[in-house]
């Protein structure tokens, strides 16, 4: 609106690829009533205007297409050749209507703009390639071997789908996947929250630049979450390999199990609850690591600035290096059943009352406690090195 005023014209003047125009010019929308079409195995949708895109299961065993698209953009091209359905609307005549606060998916007349493609339930598409410039994308009850969905400004929702490979790319919008089964799933999000619920399969990767990531009640071979700025919530996950890399944000992980568990957090609190893995590695640069009911054979924990509470329901080997913060170890059995090496440069050491203190040493402010390897503690070891902070050992 400010553009028109600055140019000395009427408010609402906008720049487009075709020049300077008024958004109040309205062309008749392009319409295609719901129409049955021939079967197809490949799908290509390109929407350069404002519209919602829906790909969903039909109620019968037939294929259909329908749309209403903004007449101020280029004329849509709809083709079905050699088993491939292609629908495209370029923005040759398009106005930047999103700058004026219009609702997502509405054209200048206020009428809802959309494309809906219907596919028989259970059909497996070979490929699906979808791009939507400004609007939501909903993929529901449709299967595909190779699926790629890109939304520049809008939400993407996946429901009850099976796929060999699925890639979601979002610039500005939320992503949601429910009851998705995939061999390979990749989600790249610039701005927006991402939610995975009841997903299953092999390799799942989520990369989020700015926005939270939530997963719940899922089972995969591997799950990798990479975040720049946003909180993480993982609840109910079975994965052979779990990897979390977080730069800024809190992480809450509960009811997860598998073989290899890795968390790297640069700035934020890490909460672990009911975690069962064979090997665990946790690195926190700035933030507390607070845990309860942890079961693992090998644990490697590194902290720079923050406290550690490690509540072990099962523990065979633990290595902990802390730079500045308190360490609280809650062990499942007596300290004497481990080979022990505790070292504190500046801080106090607190041990259970019944622990033999003959290996306790204090010299020049440094505190150490050791229990040598023996048949009694064969194969089990606890090593803690803390530069500045207290160390407390207690039992569950």
Language-model features: where?
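Short linear S-[DN]-x-LW-Φ motif typified by the pepsin-like aspartic protease active-site region
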Residues: 5-92, 96, 105-131, 136-150, ...
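An anionic, turn-rich surface loop/hairpin at beta-sheet edges
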Residues: 95-107, 358-366
């Amino acid at each position: 609106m400010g553009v028109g005023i600055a140019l000395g014209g009427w408010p609402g003047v906008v720049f487009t690829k075709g020049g300077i125009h008024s958004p109040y010019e309205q062309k008749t929308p392009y319409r295609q009533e719901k129409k049955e079409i021939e079967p197809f195995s490949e799908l290509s949708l390109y929407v350069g205007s404002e519209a919602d895109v829906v790909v969903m299961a039909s109620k019968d065993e037939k294929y259909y297409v329908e749309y209403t698209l903004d007449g101020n953009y280029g004329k849509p091209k709809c083709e079905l050749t050699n088993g491939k359905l292609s629908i495209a609307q370029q923005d040759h005549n398009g106005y930047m209507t999103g700058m004026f606060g219009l609702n997502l998916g509405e054209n200048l007349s206020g009428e809802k703009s959309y494309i809906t493609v219907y596919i028989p339930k259970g059909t497996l598409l070979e490929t699906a390639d979808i791009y939507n410039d400004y609007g939501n994308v909903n993929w529901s009850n449709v299967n595909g071997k190779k699926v790629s969905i890109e939304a520049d400004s809008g939400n993407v929702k996946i429901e009850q789908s099976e796929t060999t490979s699925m890639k979601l790319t979002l610039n500005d919008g939320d992503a949601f996947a429910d009851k998705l089964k995939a061999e390979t799933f990749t989600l790249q999000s610039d701005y927006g929250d991402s939610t995975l619920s009841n997903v299953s399969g092999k390799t799942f990767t989520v990369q989020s630049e700015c926005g939270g990531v939530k997963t719940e009640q899922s089972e995969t071979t591997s799950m990798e979450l990479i975040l720049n700025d946003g909180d993480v919530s993982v609840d109910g996950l079975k994965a052979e390999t779990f990897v979390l890399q977080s730069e800024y944000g809190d992480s809450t992980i509960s009811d997860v199990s598998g073989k290899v568990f890795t968390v790297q957090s640069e700035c934020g609190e890490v909460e672990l609850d009911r975690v069962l893995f064979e090997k665990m590695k946790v690195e926190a640069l700035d933030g507390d690591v607070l845990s309860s009911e942890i079961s693992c054979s090998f644990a490697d924990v590194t902290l720079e600035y923050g406290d550690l509470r490690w509540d072990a329901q099962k523990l065979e080997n633990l290595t902990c290096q802390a730079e500045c913060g308190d360490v609280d170890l809650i062990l499942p059995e007596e300290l004497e059943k481990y080979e022990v090496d505790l070292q504190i440069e500046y801080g106090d050491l607190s041990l259970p009352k019944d622990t033999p203190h003959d290996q306790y040493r204090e010299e020049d402010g440094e505190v150490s406690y050791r229990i040598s390897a023996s048949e009694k503690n064969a194969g089990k070891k606890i090593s803690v090195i803390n530069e500045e902070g207290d160390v407390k050992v207690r039992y569950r």
